[in-house]
Amino acid sequence: MYEFLQETVANNMTTPVRSITPETTVGDLYRFFAADDFDAYPVVQDGMLVGIVSKLDALEVFAFTEDRILPRYADGMATQVNKIMSSDVVAIDPETKLQCVLQMLTKHKVKSLPVIDQRRNLVGIIAREDVMRAMKRWTLRQ
């Protein structure tokens, strides 16, 4: 077993986390994506993780389907994140081992996972890059 995979999320996660509220508009979300170059944002209300919203979620606001006509640009940009976010979020605990993180990232095909405490308060985020940094540290020690 690779030793770095036994490290915990708490020692490798990114804090503080940039998050948004459910009332954030798609227009603001696009500006945040452009400024931060993130692929997704955790959605937090009163400190608790309530969802996650991705670039794909934001793009789907303007997608034309058989069931839905194309919305006006202003209406799409005014849409609140709570209308498009995923509420069923895969999140992990700070004491989770990187081995488990690696399995979850690949199983769910996501780039990062929110880290929450027992009360669902968002305490960090762990991304593929964080796991790669841990691997690099261990590689340099060898």
Model regions: which residues?
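The conserved cystathionine-beta-synthase
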Residues: 20-37, 44, 91-109, 116, ...
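A glycine-centered beta-loop-beta connector
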Residues: 33-36, 41-57, 105, 113-130
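Tandem CBS (Bateman) regulatory domains
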Residues: 1-16, 54-90, 97, 102-106, ...
